[in-house]
Amino acid sequence: HGSRLRRVGLHYWWGGVMIELRPITQAEAFDFIRKHHRHHSVPVGALWWHAVHDSEGVLRGVAIVGRPVARRLDDGFTVEVTRLCTDGAPNACSMLYGAARRVALDKGYRRGVTYTLPEEGGASLRASGWDYLGDTPGKSWSVKSRPRDDKHPLGLKHRWGFGEWRKEPSND
């Protein structure tokens, strides 16, 4: 059936269109983000990046994985998907998030985190083995000692993760 998703190795078929994971240079990944990301520019720093291409070789999406932006999470065992950007290709987000999770665990990281806006449903994250961890308030990076122009959404974000996360102590 041409309209159903099928995984064959590292390839996905959807409606007759195949997407597959491929390596990509940092310059290519950052260029794609500059052209296609809805609300962010390129991240500062990265540990690795990967991409999905279609059967014609057209770049359809990229993921950038780096150290956690939140200092309290930067323990040497945690990674963050700091950017994920596609052109809307079916299942590209799931493939990119799944690859980020697998690579991180294979490299010895114990957990990963990423953040989405409330209007982004999270189906791709759930499909690729990530769990909803809760909400976190957005905030500005601008402080009196170092004023900055905020160019990203400052509202509530959904936190997603995989791996070993300590449970918060209950009040029971």
Where are the model-predicted features located?
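Short, Lys/Arg-enriched N-terminal segments with co-localized hydrophobic residues
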Residues: 1-17
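Charged phosphate-binding loop/patch that engages nucleotide di/tri-phosphates or the phosphate backbone
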Residues: 158-172
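Short amphipathic alpha-helix that is part of the acyltransferase structural core
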Residues: 13-44
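Acyl-donor binding region in acyl/amide transferases
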Residues: 23, 47, 53-54, 62, ...
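A residue-level signal for beta-strand positions that form part of recognition/binding surfaces
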Residues: 18, 78, 157
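Short secondary-structure junctions
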Residues: 39-42, 131-135, 167
